[in-house]
From Swiss-Prot:
HAMAP family documented for this protein: NDH1_NuoB
Any GO molecular function: quinone binding
Highest taxon in the source lineage: Bacteria
NCBIfam families tied to this protein: nuoB_fam, PRK06411.1
EC class name: translocase
Record lineage: Bacteria, Pseudomonadati, Pseudomonadota, Gammaproteobacteria, Enterobacterales
Species of provenance: Blochmanniella floridana
Protein name stated in the entry: NADH-quinone oxidoreductase subunit B
Length: 223
């Protein structure tokens, strides 16, 4: 029997399609419009807020999982956690009907072309959440068959640490994604506004809550 080994895209031409995380802070594009035309600038600001409000409160996840972190993700959809409070309870079985994809589990090398194809089938705007240590950095699988991080072949918006993360961590990631979407600036159409995507420069929650972690001296049982 003949076997075919499918490798990840490593050519230089493919790097432009799925670049690694390369973000740089830029100024809000609405500031220039407000200076040129105060009325039109305020109108665009209201339109962006209305569109972002609708997108952030109706996030449909793609029903996709790779490993044990997927079990923790589906636990968040039970009545105990009630993820429907955030408008993200509608699991979609097709990437064309979903808003974001959660890479929950170990990204094996053979799965990379499949994940990339599913990501390409998603309609804009779309987002990616990396859930678990294996998806973030390969975890404990530092071997030839596991990609050391999803951001090697997909743009990632939110990282969830843990092995595996708790369902509460997934809910916190949804809240962070909602916060990021509310700060985004996307073109309203192909003739109006700049044809570029401006995203929020999010800082690590570990650094933001560093003082709170250091000041904690007593720990209680999570249960």
């Amino acid at each position: 029997m003949k076997y075919t080994l499918t490798l990840a895209r490593t050519n230089q031409d493919d790097d432009s399609v799925y670049p690694e995380q390369d973000q740089k802070p830029v100024a809000d594009p609405l500031d220039k419009q407000i200076e040129k035309n105060v009325y039109f600038g305020k109108l665009k600001n209201l339109l962006h807020k209305a569109v972002n409000w609708g997108r952030s409160n109706s996030l449909w996840p793609y029903n996709f999982g790779l490993s044990c972190c997927y079990v923790e993700m589906t636990t968040a959809f039970t009545a105990v956690h009630d993820v429907a409070r955030f408008g993200s309870e509608v699991l979609r079985s097709s990437p064309r009907q979903s808003d974001f994809m959660v890479i929950a589990g170990t990204p094996f090398l053979k799965m990379v072309p499949i994940i990339q194809r599913l990501y390409d089938q998603m309609l804009e705007p779309k987002w990616v959440i990396s859930m678990g240590s294996c998806a973030n950095s390969g975890g404990m699988y530092d071997i030839y068959s596991v990609v050391q991080g999803v951001d090697k072949f997909l743009p990632v918006d939110i990282y969830i640490p843990g092995c595996p993360p708790r369902p509460e961590a997934y809910i916190q990631a949804l809240l962070l994604l909602k916060k990021s979407i509310n700060k985004e600036r996307r073109p309203l159409s192909w003739v109006i506004d700049d044809q570029g995507v401006y995203k929020m420069n999010m800082k690590s929650e570990r650094e933001l809550k560093r003082k709170d972690r250091i000041s904690a001296v007593e720990f209680s049982d999570t249960d």
